[in-house]
């Protein structure tokens, strides 16, 4: 059997069935066909590292096992063939799925599966979207987003993946996972109106609590806004009601960010994120309105903070005066001041 030297020291790295075992040989990843013996060797290799991960409680050893599994996939100097990747992805999928049910191994297992970046891992990624661990759900969503392009060649599998992501986003509570699922859905070639509406609902949940915890919400707001903008740029269509919902949330985030920014309540890192948030809001609002009236591309961390707030007030409106937003969407009220109830 042809074997490929991984560049790893073939020493004992795991305990299987109570005995020490050396790393099994792996077929050359560049091979153009897979024999029965090749398939068996690939399965043995994946199973070996899954068993090694299951047999330890040392997170650093789990990371070593994960690295070993991913080396054939990520070695750009020796690219793996498509036929190898299909067999390898299936083997990793089957070997590591059982580890998703173990709290000690679930995170390293899903990171391993997600970073194979092959559509053969779809079943495990979909299953992990309902895991009790938020970090596992995040990586499951990321993994599915990364393979949506491959799955588009298989419409039934592609639609199934999108349905799983949409169902997950509809019930997800964790802000970071919401952002991750929205980003995954934005990787679709033609995002659906439902995907965009769900992402906008997620953004609305961030906006409703924004005045209470702005530093915590800023990164997830920015990530979700970018995902929504990507969906819209790819043709996702919003109903008038969802447009209003989106503009209301974006205006709220834009206004509250500008208020915190002007007040000096953000540290240096948060200030940089705030500038990104303001620009992201403006860009998304322009995409929704098919205009260039909300853009804040000209601002940067050196821009006078009071001037930024005045500019934003002119766009979103404030408690004293209506803004451009109310001219276009009369039903969308101006955002409240930070001192008021959001």
Feature locations, PLM:
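Amphipathic alpha-helical scaffolding segments comprising HEAT/armadillo-like alpha-solenoid repeats
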Residues: 26-31, 36-53, 79-99, 118-130, ...
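Amphipathic alpha-helical segments within extended alpha-helical solenoids and repeat-rich scaffolds
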Residues: 85-97, 159-172, 197-215, 243-267, ...
